[in-house]
């Protein structure tokens, strides 16, 4: 319908006005143009192919002639689609155009019916209607220009208002806009959106899959025909058409048919109509390229045979004809048409069908059906003419050939569509199987039964069996092997040299799943060896499991006869076809065999069946493997639980140690030097280290603040110490130093004012636990060796392990200092408070309970003696009821709430992970940005996390800020641990370690220490002391140690080898500074310049400056040459000493000690000249030493100092 109207205001109609001599104007039936004049509104609508109710039907072309005031005619033409059938033109092109007013309009509206001269609406005459149209047209012509201008001004004004006040426009839309305007606006918006091209194929496929099987067997055309008229009427209608029209009509009938059954039925019926054949059959090609055969899709179909009957007959008795057998078989093999006039005279004709049905076959026309590539996809056969002719003539052959050409395209399309439907259903089944794998992963029997049921229903077989192989992968040890080496298969490949019997013994079946008919339940059994050996089906499955090959058997008896390995004793007469396929796991190891027995229709299993069954086998393997892995994982989890229980027992400190520590006197913090940044643990024994930790907790008021039971705290400290390995550096002593530095930063550095008590508790715990169970190797080594820790934690490997060990200790019985709820208060707990001496444990809550108990006793029994033993026994009794006493005295154990527990554990985890230098580099820039912006409020969660992370790193590397006598010893320990890792990398990984871990480059340690200080330590301490000036000693100590390391690095560069053994000995400065100590265990190798010449011409060179003397300087460096900077520095030193200036103290002391030591041990005469001073003595002594080759006492540890003078 086309509505033509104009807006109020007199806009001209956009309908084209043409004169009678001009070409007719056409307007599409889908266009919509409004046309109004004042209060009147006229609608012009056109409909094609029918008459509206109440209208008078008209004839003609369907145009609407209407005269205007100027004598023009309004002509609206429309186009409609012609009908598929060849109807007369007058019938197919009938149309009408009507002008009507919408409901509710005034009486001025009119309705016109076409053609001209027909009766008009009952309310108006034709002349009145024509006058109305002329009036509207003239008014539109006069007001077109003014209306257009006013409309544009209105648009501009409204647009300006909307732009200035969009809120008002939105409010008007939501509150006062007419519904019609909103619907038009919504329609306009929808039309502006980009639309996807409609997929006809997808819609058709979805409609097909949603339809019922009954509807799918019938095409839409057949449904409409069956409802409209009977078959004889359709036949009479087709007979009225000429041959060309009939041929095209029949082609259109099969062109869009996608159901293969309906298509074949239509082909046979239509061929009967075209050739006047009595009945026909259609065969489709099946089978493999080497074994092809024809299957009768529909057989003996007449023009009166219904589709349902034809399909039922073909399904009940399936006819299979091999290529080359019979008339149809010869046509399929030769691709040549066969036209037989007398069937019984042809030797290829099989008269058995005629004998069964009583029908006599005379003439036969059989023709191949090929696809676009020329391959045979079917054979069509028609028999006996119905028009009195006794044979099929050339005209019938030509029509048959032409029609089958189009039918070949339709058949192939239908087959492709059928394959798509089958693939779709197959995918749905496989998705259901995948879903079942996750649903039934804890029940292997249910999973296998569900898979077998789906396979049996899809492949239409009689029986289905699954044999499971007894493998090592069924044991938990297999999963452990996979975890140890995830990139290597844990299964052992079968060697080709193994015999069949040896392979067979390794693949022994342990479980058998059997599923019979449709209504039979699954049977699960564990067959014995004798049962397996006597069963042919089990032997075939054993053959498949051993060889790993898929077996598709058409004749079981013949196959068993051809394979001598099968020695079965049971009867196999009922077994016709077997499809047997191996089931493999993720490691490509056969874990079972799936077996299908006998298709329901008696035919062998095809390649398509094997392909579908392969998918079932894959999903079955995944499900079985997944279920077995789940069972193994459960076993391993149980093992892990037992191992953790054992580990927790052995990792926890003993009760004797705990009781001893609880009874020990805890000295004051000053006696341990805990407040100082120069703290050292060298003088502390192991028990003192634990006491120092307890004192730090007490001084931070954590014991009383969180009411930590004292025996729990002591046991936890001892357990933490016990879980550190005896490595050279990352041991319990290192954890103690880190915790002490944190304590000093909190107390001396006044950082506690930025932290809550809960955060202080978390930081101290994190410091003590940050290297738990350290193995002396870093994260990179764990990743390179693919250790279980690297598999468990992909990032910050060791740090995550340290935190997990911390949690393990806390979760151990009697070690949870973060325990929630009321803490357990026993007699042992409070008894530990007695005898601590001097009130050193004043923060211990047990003392409060004991005081309450004693006051209560003497209040009620004042005559008791305070020293009486009765008092002690009564006190012990009161302690047993301490909970009641605490309630009465309002002293409840305020242990951590669940929220506080989560908070402190989060602090501990974040702090321990922050000790990874990779995390430090990630957080450093954000922290520097906050400091540079002058941040002073550190109470935000993110800012507090950054601050705690920087403090943990500062404490972790705080050994670099210790006094020099402490720092260089710690550096030796770190270097030794690194060198051990480097040795492991050479031994296990066969790789060259980095310089800091290479024992052969240990001389570079001072230089590497300087680099470590410059890159990590100094920037960190600088920014911390700039923000928190109370921790400046860390920065100053680091600067001092950097100067020492730099000085030592320069001397090593000059040729001083300060390391000569696997363990690092004292540096040069330590000996140089000890002027009063006698040096006994150092071997000196002194090289002078031209010693022989000097002994002969001493007077000659006595006045020559050292730096101008000829000769080469011999260095003890490996390269044998000194750098330019070293030569310059050495020359200046020697020149200044010869000029009488005071040399450096270290060199002077060194020279004196060397000369005295060499003089005492040298066999030279005492009358040797001494005028040359210390240098002369050094030269003489050195030459004598070199000549004599004397050695220092071998029983002492020896180090080598090479001094170049």
Curated annotation (Swiss-Prot):
Q: Which cysteines are joined by disulfide bonds?
A: none
Q: Which InterPro entries would you find in this protein's record?
A: GAF, GAF-like_dom_sf, HD/PDEase_dom, PDEase, PDEase_catalytic_dom, PDEase_catalytic_dom_sf, PDEase_CS
All residue ranges annotated as the PDEase domain in the record: 654-1052
- Chain ranges of the GAF domain: 259-411, 443-624
Question: Catalytic positions?
Answer: 730 (proton donor)
Catalysed reaction, written as an equation:
3',5'-cyclic GMP + H2O = GMP + H(+)
The EC number(s) given in the record are 3.1.4.35
Q: Which keywords accompany this UniProt record?
A: Cell membrane, cGMP, Hydrolase, Lipoprotein, Membrane, Metal-binding, Methylation, Prenylation, Repeat
Q: Where is the composition biased (Basic and acidic residues)?
A: 1098-1109, 1152-1162
Composition bias type Low complexity, residue spans: 18-32, 62-71, 118-140, 1171-1191
Q: Name one GO cellular component term.
A: plasma membrane
Cysteine methyl ester occurs at which residues? 1202
> Where is region (Disordered) located?
1-153, 1093-1122, 1152-1205
Record propeptide residues: 1203-1205
**Is the Oxidoreductase keyword given for this protein?**
no
List cofactor names only: a divalent metal cation
Bias (Basic residues): 1195-1205
**Cofactor: binding details:** Binds 2 divalent metal cations per subunit. Site 1 may preferentially bind zinc ions, while site 2 has a preference for magnesium and/or manganese ions.
The GO biological-process annotations, alphabetized, read as: cGMP metabolic process; signal transduction
Which residues take part in binding a divalent metal cation 2? 771
Q: How does it assemble?
A: Interacts with PrBP.
Q: What is this protein called?
A: cGMP-specific 3',5'-cyclic phosphodiesterase
């Amino acid at each position: 319908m086309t509505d033509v109207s104009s807006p109020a205001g007199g806009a001209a109609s956009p309908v084209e006005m043409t004169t009678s001599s001009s070409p007719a104007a056409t307007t599409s039936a889908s266009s919509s143009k409004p046309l109004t004049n004042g209060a009147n509104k006229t609608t012009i609508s056109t409909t094609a192919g029918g008459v509206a109710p109440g209208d008078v039907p008209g004839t003609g072309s369907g145009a609407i002639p209407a005269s205007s005031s100027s004598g023009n005619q309004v002509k609206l033409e429309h186009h409609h689609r012609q009908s598929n059938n060849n109807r007369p033109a007058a019938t197919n092109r009938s149309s009408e155009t009507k002008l009507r007013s919408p409901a509710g309009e005034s009486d001025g509206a009119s309705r016109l019916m076409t053609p001209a001269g027909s009766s008009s609406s009952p309310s108006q005459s034709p002349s009145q209607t024509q006058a109305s149209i002329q009036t509207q047209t003239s008014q539109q012509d006069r007001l077109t220009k003014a209306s257009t201008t006013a409309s544009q001004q209105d648009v501009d004004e409204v647009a300006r208002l909307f732009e200035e006040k969009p809120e008002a426009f939105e409010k008007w839309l939501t509150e006062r806009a007419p519904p019609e305007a909103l619907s038009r606006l919504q329609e306009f918006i929808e039309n502006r959106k980009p639309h996807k091209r409609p997929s006809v194929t997808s819609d058709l496929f979805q409609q097909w899959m949603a339809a019922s099987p009954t509807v799918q067997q019938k095409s839409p055309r057949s449904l409409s025909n069956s409802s409209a008229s009977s078959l004889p009427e359709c036949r009479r209608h087709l007979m009225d058409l000429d041959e060309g029209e009939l041929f095209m009509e029949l082609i259109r009938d099969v062109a869009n048919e996608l159901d293969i059954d309906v298509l074949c039925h239509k082909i046979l019926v239509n061929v009967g109509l075209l050739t006047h054949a009595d009945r026909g059959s259609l065969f489709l090609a099946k089978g493999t390229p080497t074994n092809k055969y024809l299957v009768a899709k529909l057989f003996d179909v007449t023009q009166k045979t219904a589709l349902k009957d034809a399909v039922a007959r073909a399904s009940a008795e399936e006819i299979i004809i091999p290529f080359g057998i019979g008339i149809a078989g010869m046509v399929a093999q030769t691709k040549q048409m066969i036209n037989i006039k007398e069937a019984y005279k042809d030797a290829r004709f099989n008269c058995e069908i005629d004998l069964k049905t009583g029908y006599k076959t005379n003439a036969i026309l059989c023709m191949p059906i090929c696809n676009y590539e020329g391959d045979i996809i079917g054979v069509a056969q028609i028999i006996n003419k119905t028009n009195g002719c006794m044979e099929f003539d050339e005209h019938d052959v030509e029509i048959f050939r032409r029609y089958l050409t189009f039918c070949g395209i339709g058949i192939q399309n239908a087959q492709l569509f059928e394959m798509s439907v089958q693939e779709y259903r197959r995918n749905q089944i496989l998705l259901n199987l995948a879903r079942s794998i996750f649903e039934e992963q804890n029940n292997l029997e249910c999973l296998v039964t569900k898979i077998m049921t789906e396979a049996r229903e899809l492949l239409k077989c009689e029986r289905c069996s699954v044999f499971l192989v007894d493998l090592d992968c069924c044991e938990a040890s297999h999963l452990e092997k996979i975890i140890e080496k995830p990139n290597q298969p844990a299964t052992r490949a079968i060697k080709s040299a193994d015999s069949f019997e040896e392979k067979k013994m390794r693949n022994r079946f342990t479980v058998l799943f059997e599923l019979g008919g449709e209504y039979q339940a699954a049977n699960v059994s564990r067959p014995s060896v004798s049962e397996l050996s006597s069963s042919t089906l089990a032997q075939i499955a054993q053959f498949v499991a051993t060889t790993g090959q898929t077996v598709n058997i058409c004749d079981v008896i013949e196959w068993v006869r051809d394979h001598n390995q099968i020695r079965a004793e049971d009867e196999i007469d009922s077994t016709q076809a077997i499809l047997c396929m191996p089931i493999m796991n993720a490691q490509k190891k056969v874990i079972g065999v799936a077996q299908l027995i006998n298709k329901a229709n008696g035919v062998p299993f095809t390649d398509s069946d094997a392909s579908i069954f392969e998918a079932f086998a894959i999903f079955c393997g995944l499900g079985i493997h997944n279920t077995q892995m789940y069972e193994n994982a459960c076993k391993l989890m149980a093992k892990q639980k037992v191992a953790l229980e054992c580990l927790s027992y052995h990792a926890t400190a003993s009760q004797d140690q705990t009781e001893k520590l609880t009874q020990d006197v805890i000295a004051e913090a000053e006696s341990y030097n805990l407040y100082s940044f120069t703290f050292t643990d060298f003088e502390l024994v192991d028990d003192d280290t634990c006491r120092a930790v307890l004192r730090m907790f007490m001084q931070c008021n954590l014991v009383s603040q969180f009411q930590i039971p004292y025996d729990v705290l002591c046991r936890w400290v001892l357990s933490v110490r016990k879980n550190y390995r005896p490595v050279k550096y990352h041991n319990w002593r290192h954890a103690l130093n880190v915790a002490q530095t944190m304590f000093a930063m909190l107390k001396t550095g006044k950082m506690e004012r930025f932290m809550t008590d809960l955060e202080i508790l978390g930081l101290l715990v994190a410091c003590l636990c940050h290297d738990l169970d350290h193995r002396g190797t870093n994260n990179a080594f764990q990743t390179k060796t693919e250790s279980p820790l690297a598999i468990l934690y992909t990032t910050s490997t060791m740090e995550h392990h340290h935190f997990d060990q911390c949690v393990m200790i806390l979760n151990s019985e009697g070690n949870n200092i973060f325990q929630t709820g009321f803490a357990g208060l026993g007699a042992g707990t409070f008894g530990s408070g007695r005898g601590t001496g001097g009130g050193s444990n004043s923060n211990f809550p047990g003392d409060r309970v004991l005081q309450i108990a004693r006051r209560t006793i003497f209040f009620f029994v004042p005559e008791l003696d305070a020293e009486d033993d009765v008092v002690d026994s009564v006190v012990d009794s009161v302690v047993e009821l301490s909970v009641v006493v605490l309630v009465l005295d309002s002293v409840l154990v305020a242990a951590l709430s669940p929220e506080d527990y989560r908070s402190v554990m989060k602090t501990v985890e974040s702090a321990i992970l922050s000790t990874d230098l990779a995390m430090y580099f990630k957080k450093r820039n954000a922290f520097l940005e906050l400091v540079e912006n002058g941040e002073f409020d550190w109470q935000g969660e993110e800012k507090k996390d950054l601050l705690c992370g920087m403090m943990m790193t500062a404490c972790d590397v705080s050994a670099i800020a210790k006094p020099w006598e402490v720092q260089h010893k710690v550096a030796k320990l770190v270097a030794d641990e690194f060198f051990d890792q480097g040795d492991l990398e050479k031994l296990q990984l066969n790789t060259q370690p980095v310089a800091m871990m290479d024992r052969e480059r240990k001389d570079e340690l001072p230089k590497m220490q300087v680099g470590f200080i410059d890159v990590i330590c100094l920037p960190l301490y600088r920014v911390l002391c700039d923000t928190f000036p109370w921790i400046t000693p860390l920065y100053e100590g680091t600067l001092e140690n950097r100067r020492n390391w730099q000085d030592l690095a320069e001397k090593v560069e000059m040729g001083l080898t300060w390391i000569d053994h696997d363990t690092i000995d004292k540096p040069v400065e330590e000996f140089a500074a000890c002027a009063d100590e006698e040096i006994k265990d150092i071997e000196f190798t002194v090289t002078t310049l031209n010693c022989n010449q000097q002994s002969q011409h001493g007077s000659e060179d006595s006045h020559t400056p050292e730096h101008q003397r000829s000769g080469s300087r011999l260095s003890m460096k490996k390269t044998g040459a000194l750098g330019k900077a070293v030569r310059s520095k050495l020359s200046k030193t020697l020149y200044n000493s010869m000029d009488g200036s005071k040399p450096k103290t270290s060199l002077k002391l060194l020279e004196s000690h060397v000369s005295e030591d060499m003089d005492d041990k040298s066999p030279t005469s005492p009358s040797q000249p001494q005028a040359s001073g210390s240098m002369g003595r050094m030269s003489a002594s050195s030459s004598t030493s070199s000549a004599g080759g004397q050695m220092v006492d071998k029983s002492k540890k020896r180090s080598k100092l090479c001094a170049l003078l």
